[in-house]
Amino acid sequence: MGETEIEKVSDTTFVLQMGPHHPATHGVLKLLCEFEGERVINIKPDVGYLHRGVEKLSESKTYPGAMTLTDRLDYISSMTNNIGYCLAVERLMGIEPPPRAKFIRTMVSEMTRLSSHLLWLATHALDIGAMTVFLYAFREREQILQFFEKICGARLTVSYPRIGGVRVDIKEHVLDEIYKFMDLMLIRVDEYETLLTENRIWIARTRGVGVIAPEDAVLLGLTGPALRGSGVYYDIRKQIPYDAYSEIDFEVPLGEKGDTYDRYLCRIREMRQSVLIVKQCIEKMPEGKILSDKSPDIDLPHQAKRKIEPGDSLWNGFIAFSEEKQEIMPKGEIYSAIEAPKGELGFYIVSDGSGRPYRMRVRAPSFIHISAIPKLCEGHLLADVIAIIGTLDIVMGEADR
């Protein structure tokens, strides 16, 4: 079947297949849209085209080695994926990162949020027809990716956080450059709003479109801007603070009507808050270590089955994660979640005491939000479906896993 193939199911309704290679689905998402006339009466999402078995693959990886798999969930926000996974393992192992590492992780988390929201704004605006914003947003996102490159040498799949801290420290001149860029970023966000927020066409395409009531948003499991756009105050950075968020002052933007326009405004306002958080992290960042003394080293080669001696490992001579079936991790299970750019990203890990996860389950916000598409699109036109999908900010890498 092609990108858009029409199947007649009765004299009054027809089914239009959208995707899995349609540019507006932002990935390999297929939607079977049933119409009566020009109005949507039902949508059936069809996922799985990007399934790579991340959760099963993690069972054959060591805890540090599974980091590269988390990079490739929401590949737009690899930094927050890494941090979410590290926090889960740290809580399981009882490791506390040093204060400087916490501030660094909070700072790069918010830079990732900015990068993610910029890409969302660019593609969402392009879907609706605002070409200029697409170009402007990519200009700023490129700056943020260049900062990531200066910090750790990678732009997209960074693998920068570590269990117990971060991989390398950030040089002072890089922190100064980031601080100056944040001042510029506030001006840029004002420019985006000048082009869109009061634009008559933008308002006509987004206001009153894809409305979801607060109680329905909660029942569907929406999180992040998709939930806060309906006026529900839920932000893990506030409710269950992690890293340095408890020491940072910021507000949580909320919508009122729960439509596409409110979800747009929430993300725009979040970008301003992220700028303020980054600046506070730089101002308050303490000196000191960036990695806990209890942090595990990366795995030995697979053929190695010996105990690591003192001096061989960053883990002070403890038995690191080798292929020997020895109890080197606490047995048990844990669920740990963070506020990723798209919503609640959670990791459920079961430990059997070995150096590898017995089971890892990822709670990806994009997968949950796809399930809300039928509810949001019911009664709307096909053009509105494009706007609604864009406002949910779906990435299929984490949805299919």
UniProtKB/Swiss-Prot annotation:
Pfam families: Complex1_49kDa. Coiled coil: none annotated. NDH-1 shuttles electrons from NADH, via FMN and iron-sulfur (Fe-S) centers, to quinones in the respiratory chain. The immediate electron acceptor for the enzyme in this species is believed to be ubiquinone. Couples the redox reaction to proton translocation (for every two electrons transferred, four hydrogen ions are translocated across the cytoplasmic membrane), and thus conserves the redox energy in a proton gradient. This is NADH-quinone oxidoreductase subunit D 2. Disulfide bonds: none annotated. PROSITE patterns: COMPLEX1_49K (PS00535). NDH-1 is composed of 14 different subunits. Subunits NuoB, C, D, E, F, and G constitute the peripheral sector of the complex. Its EC number is 7.1.1.-. It comes from Thermodesulfovibrio yellowstonii (strain ATCC 51303 / DSM 11347 / YP87). NCBIfam families: NuoD, PRK06075.1. The keyword Translocase applies. One of its GO terms (molecular function) is NAD binding. Belongs to the complex I 49 kDa subunit family. SUPFAM superfamilies: HydB/Nqo4-like. It is a peripheral membrane protein. Keywords: Cell inner membrane, Cell membrane, Membrane, NAD, Quinone, Translocase, Transport, Ubiquinone.
